């Protein structure tokens, strides 16, 4: 039994809290820690990692560069861990035909703009757009074309969906809102 009214459509958007992002964060932190420890080992002359000998690595320039890469990797890993923890990019797209409003909500980074909330009047939405780019890194973005505003993306930028799925999503939303579809 579907208890959702026919005049409301809600789509939840997955953010950056994915298994792949968590794996990359762990790999980055572990690799960067190894680089930092080997670089620091070459500085003090003792092996901090027993299975890796730092006797063949001179501190200047190899050890210094490894320390730099280790610190940079730790910052990138920490950044990725924070985006996973805060679930940046998650949210919802809400369309209500009875009230005549649309609400697009996303979580951002902590601060005064943590909550990104865009409210629109359904009458201002001109079309549903589907921007497709093929090639080595294909991308398909579903967006709303709004009168007097920039286009508002509805899907994640890194979302890798099939053309058929995205076309079906665009057609479903256009049918629900009774507006046209544009493509690029």
Swiss-Prot record:
The chain crosses the membrane at residues 20-42, 57-79. InterPro entries: PSI_Ycf4_assembly. Its main location: plastid. The keyword Plastid applies. It comes from the Eukaryota. Pfam families: Ycf4 (PF02392). It is found in: Plastid, Chloroplast thylakoid membrane. GO terms for biological process: photosynthesis. GO terms for cellular component: chloroplast thylakoid membrane; photosystem I. It is a multi-pass membrane protein. Keywords: Chloroplast, Membrane, Photosynthesis, Plastid, Thylakoid, Transmembrane, Transmembrane helix. Belongs to the Ycf4 family. Seems to be required for the assembly of the photosystem I complex. This is Photosystem I assembly protein Ycf4. It comes from Adiantum capillus-veneris (Maidenhair fern).
């Amino acid at each position: 039994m579907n208890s959702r009214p026919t005049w409301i459509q809600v789509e939840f958007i997955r953010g950056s809290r994915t298994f792949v992002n968590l794996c990359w964060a762990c790999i980055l932190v572990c690799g960067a820690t190894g680089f930092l420890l080997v670089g620091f080992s070459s500085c003090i002359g003792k092996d901090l990692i027993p299975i890796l000998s730092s006797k063949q690595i001179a501190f200047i320039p190899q050890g210094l560069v490894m320390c730099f890469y280790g610190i940079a990797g730790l910052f990138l890993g920490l950044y990725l861990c924070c985006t996973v923890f805060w679930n940046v990019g998650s949210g919802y797209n809400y369309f209500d035909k009875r009230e005549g409003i649309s609400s697009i909500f996303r979580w951002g980074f902590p601060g005064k703009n943590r909550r990104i909330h865009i409210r629109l009047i359904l009458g201002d939405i001109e079309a549903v757009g589907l921007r497709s780019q093929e090639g080595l890194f294909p991308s398909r973005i579903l967006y709303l074309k709004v009168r007097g505003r920039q286009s508002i993306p509805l899907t994640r930028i890194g979302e890798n969906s099939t053309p058929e799925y995205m076309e079906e999503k665009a057609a479903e939303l256009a049918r629900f809102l009774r507006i046209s579809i544009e493509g690029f």
